[in-house]
Amino acid sequence: MQIDAASSDERYQIRKLDVTDKNKGFMELLQQLTVCDSVSDEEFQKRFEELRSCGDDHVICVIEDLVLSKIVATGSVFIEKKFIRNCGKVGHVEDVVVDSSARGLQLGKKVIGFLVDHARMTGCYKVILDCSADNKAFYEKCGFKEKEIQMVKYFI
């Protein structure tokens, strides 16, 4: 599908996640990122309310294609409160994905910009993320630098 660049800003709306976004393909979009089991409407509603109760400490950004009424990009940032750096805060970017049909439209950069701006406005002294080697160049274009090594231990 070809998108007219002139109408792109009118076609795509960037905003915070809404509970109705489950019906606009939000969960299917996450399946393009990682293993994502089926979530009932009730489970989605409960998790949505739980995250919303965190206020500015956990924000999920989405981009909706207004023509298709479909969520085509998403990402989240959660704020870690620390004792170091004068009780500073760190933003952790997670779960960034752009629908395969909408890649190349700079939507990923818009999601990252939204999340980084949110972290900055809430007083974070830095924003960090983990990514695959395949996505390193994208994040460098968004102003991130490689630093140190990620480690993980799975429980499931």
Task: List each model region and its residues.
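Conserved beta-strand-loop-alpha-helix junction that forms the acyl-donor binding cleft
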Residues: 128-137, 152-156
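Conserved beta-strand in the GNAT
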Residues: 62, 70-79, 97
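A short helix-loop-beta-strand connector motif used in the catalytic cores of GNAT acetyltransferases and
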Residues: 49-62, 92, 150
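Glycine-rich phosphate/pyrophosphate-binding loop shared by adenosine-nucleotide-utilizing enzymes
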Residues: 12, 68-74, 91
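Conserved acetyl-CoA-binding loop-helix of GNAT-fold acetyltransferases
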Residues: 98, 104-117
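Conserved N-terminal entry element of GNAT/NAT acetyltransferase domains
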Residues: 1-21
